[in-house]
Amino acid sequence: RDDVESRGLGDVYKRQVQKEVADRMQCGPGTKDYGALSLAVQFYARPKVVLNVPASCFMPRPNVDSAVIRLERFKTPPVDVKNEHLMFKIIRASFNQRRKTMLNSVGNSGIGITKEALTNALETMGLPLTIRGEALTLEQFAQLSNLLC
C-alpha cells in the first residue's frame, strides 16, 4: 500500500513480485486470496498482471514463480470515503480473523467500534449480521466506514 499510496510515483507503476502477491493484489471478494492487500491496492490503483515469470528464469532457481504487475494510479479513489484511516482500520480488523463474522472480528478488534454501532451500520446497508469481511466489496467497506464516522 505504501508504494501505491506514495505521491511521488507516476501514473503507471510496474513491479515484479511473487506471483501469489500479484494474484492477491488483483482479486475480488469471495476468493480465497482476497484481503486487506487487495483492497488497499485497488483503492489507489488498477492492478493488472502483465507478465508471468516462472521460477526457471532465475539462477539460482527460487521456490516461487514471479509476476510483473502494472498498477495504474487513480487520479481520485474509485470510492468516496470520509475517513481513509478509519476505513483501512476496519478492513484490517475484518481480515485479522478471516473466518469470523464482521461483528466479531471488527467488534472485538479494539479499534473503537462497538458491536451495536456495527450492527446498525450493517442493517442500514441491508447486509446480514453474519457477513464476513471477505464478502464485502471496496464500495461496501467505504459505505460502512462512512456510516461509522
Language-model regions: role of each:
Residues R1-Y13:
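Single conserved hydrophobic/aromatic residue that forms the stacking wall/gate
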Residues D11, P29-A40:
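A short alpha->loop->secondary-structure connector
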Residues D11-D23:
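Conserved beta-strand signature within the Rossmann-like core of class I S-adenosyl-L-methionine
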Residues Q18, I69, T137:
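Residue-level signature of catalytic and energy-coupling elements of molecular machines
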Residues R24-M25, L144:
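Residues that scaffold the ATP/ADP-binding catalytic core of kinase and kinase-like folds
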Residues M25-P29, P62-N63:
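Short aromatic-enriched loop/helix-cap "lid" or pocket-rim segments at secondary-structure transitions
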Residues L39-G112:
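Substrate-binding/catalytic lobe of Class I Rossmann-like enzymes that use SAM or dcSAM, i.e.
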Residues R73, I91-C149:
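C-terminal lobe and adjacent flexible extensions of AdoMet/dcAdoMet transferase-like proteins
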